[in-house]
Amino acid sequence: MSTRPVLLALALLTAGCREAPDPSPFPDPQRPVAPIVSPRYSNEDPRDSAGEFEKVVELAGIQPGMSIADVGAGEGYYSVRLAPLVGAKGRVLAQDIVPQTRDALAQGLTRERLDKVAVKLGLPNDPMLPETSFDRILLIHMYHEIERPSEFLWNLRPSLKRDGSVV
């Protein structure tokens, strides 16, 4: 008996024995993911005249003394408006994944002396927020840009306080 067919059969069998790559524990989104076009959602005037901030604050139940994370803060539309609202006992954390946007926001906050707002750089699929820290986490005009939403939300959850919520 020739060893050639046996070796060929063994080669074919072992070729299929490579370890499969680990599948992601998170499913891919079943939707298109929008690119990050700009750190600015739209002109502030139309947002202000529509009462956007006031509506969000009311529906989210944001009160003085709360800790709020503004994820995907961009230029800080919400962050700068939340600072006086949360008052002396509250705090605001503005988070973004684009270093230049984060830096520009930090400079603007320093210039305006809004020391109530801290600025943090996050990752596309992990906002890198401290655990058990926030009463509300705002995801305003940015969720459609998240490439892996299940993973993002999984990483976001530990940062909520017991009765906290995502808006």
Where are these regions (language model features)?
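Bacterial N-terminal signal peptides that target proteins for export
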Residues: 1-7
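C-terminal motif of bacterial Sec signal peptides marking the signal peptidase cleavage site
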Residues: 14-16
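Class I SAM-dependent transferase core
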Residues: 18-69
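Short glycine-centered segments of the SAM/dcSAM-binding site in methyltransferase folds
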Residues: 67, 91, 163-166
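Class I SAM-dependent methyltransferase SAM/SAH-binding core
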Residues: 69, 74-127
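A short glycine-rich, Lys/Arg-flanked "PGG" loop and its adjoining helix->strand segment in the class I
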Residues: 83-84, 150-165
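A short acidic, Gly/Pro-enriched loop at the edge of an enzyme's catalytic core
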Residues: 127-137
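A short SAM/SAH-binding and catalytic strip from SAM-dependent methyltransferases
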Residues: 135-149
